[in-house]
Structure formats: C-alpha cells, structure tokens
C-alpha cells in the first residue's frame, strides 16, 4: 500500500511540474511598443538623447554634424584550391571630426570564426537535444575550425610597420602622432583567412562543395578589415561582433 502511495505521489508531482512548465511556456514576454532593446546594459542615449550642435533630440543632423571617410584600395585573391582569401588593402582615413585621434580602430569581423573566438560562449540555449553526426563531431570531436583573420602586416604609407593590438573582432592601430582634425592618414594591411564550409554551420559567408562537378560555390560577406565608426555619439564604436547584429560602416 505504501509503495502504491509513493508511486501515486510521484506521478502527481510530475503532472504538476508539466502543467506549470506549460503555463510558463504560454506566457508571452510583454514589452513597450517601439522599445526592442531590453538589455539592462543598454546605453542611456537610447532613452535620453540630449540635443546639441551635432544632432537634434530626434537624431536629425545639426549644423556641426560630420561623418568620417574611409577610402579603400584592395587587391583580393580567391584561392579556390585551398578555400582561402588573400588580401592586401590600403586605407586612407579622413578625420572630419573636431577631435584629434590618438589611435585607429579596425573591425575584424571574420575573427568571430577564429579558433579562440568567444562567440560560442554566448549561446545560452544549453546542450542541444539531438545532433546530426556531422554537427556532433564538429562540436565535440574535431579540431575547431580556424576561420579568423591572419594579419601578416600593418604598415604606414612609407612602408614602416605600425604596432597594433587585436582583441577578438577589434584591432587597435597605434599611430606615431595624433591624427588632427581635417587631416588624413594612409596605411596598409596584408591578411588572409580560411573560408568555412557553409554546409556545416550555415554561416553568412562560406562555400559549398559539389562533388559531381568538382567545384565550389562561394557566398562571401564581411571579408576585409574595415574601419570602425567614429561619431559624436560615443566616439569609437569598438563593441565586439559576436555573429549577430550589424554595425554601421
């Protein structure tokens, strides 16, 4: 009899847990109309934009509004045999802001696929219930794919090396002297990276191999180091790129 009571109590507990979980799943998150950023760490200017000479409270350009300018000259080579992209680019950056810039920030979006990328750690969905054999091997067995930028050199317009620091998807370039308002600077970056197999992770960029034809089809995006935005709102926009979202150019 006691055994029956324990079994009945256990079934009743499980039934209650299932009902509660169902009720929690049916509750939809409410949010204020027009407000989509619910992060507790969002920037104050999203809620309290102060008007100034650069822009009005509505965000419209003011009399002192400016935009920086970056000109690119690139030599790009697609190594189809090894599924790699090699590039060398010269960037001419025009400082149209009223500020003197002591360093430059460059976005390295492809580093989201680097071997040591922290992007996978942002996945808070827990362990998948089921894996395909390929996805399981890719996640737990195979050596992580290294699709990040390999920066071979960063040089000024006279060919002298510039020191730089890479932090995940951002690179800070140190310049010899501050770039004053109204001036411009030219520098070059030589780089390459491995192109990922699009059929494995369905990334925004990658290739798909067709054995019958013996060739690859490529979809390429965010493939070159590009200048980060410098604006009157927050100065340098040097937030990390984690694989979702977009930044201004």
PLM features per residue range, with description:
Residues 83-112, 117, 128-132:
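Ligand-binding face of N-terminal immunoglobulin V-set domains in extracellular IgSF glycoproteins
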Residues 169-173, 185:
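Short strand-edge motifs at loop-to-beta-strand transitions and within beta-strands
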Residues 89-91, 95, 108-110, 183-197:
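Short, hydrophobic/aromatic-enriched beta-strand segments in well-ordered soluble domains
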Residues 1-25:
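Bacterial Sec-dependent N-terminal signal peptides
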Residues 31, 109-144:
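Acidic glycine/proline-rich low-complexity segments
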Residues 128-153, 157, 190-249:
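Extended, low-hydrophobicity, Ser/Thr/Pro/Gly-biased non-transmembrane segments
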Residues 21-85, 221, 239, 243-246:
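N-terminal, polar/Ser/Thr-rich
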Residues 103-104, 116-119, 166, 197-206:
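Short, solvent-exposed loop/turn and secondary-structure capping segments
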């Amino acid at each position: 009899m006691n055994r029956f009571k324990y079994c009945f109590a256990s079934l009743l507990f499980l039934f209650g847990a299932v009902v509660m979980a169902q009720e929690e799943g049916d509750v939809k998150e409410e949010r204020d109309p027009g407000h989509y950023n619910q992060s507790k760490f969002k920037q104050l200017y999203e809620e309290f934009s102060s008007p100034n000479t650069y822009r009005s409270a509505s965000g419209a350009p003011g009399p002192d509004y400016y935009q920086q300018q970056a000109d690119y000259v690139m030599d790009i080579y697609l190594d189809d045999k090894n599924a790699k992209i090699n590039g060398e680019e010269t960037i001419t950056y025009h400082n149209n802001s009223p500020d003197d810039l002591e360093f430059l920030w460059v976005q390295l979006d492809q580093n989201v696929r680097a071997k040591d990328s922290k992007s996978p750690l942002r996945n808070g969905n827990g362990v998948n219930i089921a894996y395909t054999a390929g996805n399981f091997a890719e996640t737990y067995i195979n050596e992580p794919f290294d699709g990040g930028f390999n920066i071979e050199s960063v040089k000024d317009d006279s060919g002298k090396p510039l020191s730089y620091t890479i932090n995940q998807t951002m690179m800070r370039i140190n310049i010899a002297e501050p770039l004053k308002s109204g001036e411009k600077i030219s520098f070059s970056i030589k780089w390459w990276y491995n192109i990922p197999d699009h059929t494995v992770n369905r990334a925004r960029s990658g290739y798909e191999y067709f054995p019958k034809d013996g060739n690859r089809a490529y979809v390429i995006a965010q493939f070159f180091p590009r200048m980060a935005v410098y604006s009157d709102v927050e100065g340098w926009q040097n937030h990390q790129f984690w694989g979702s979202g977009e930044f201004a150019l």
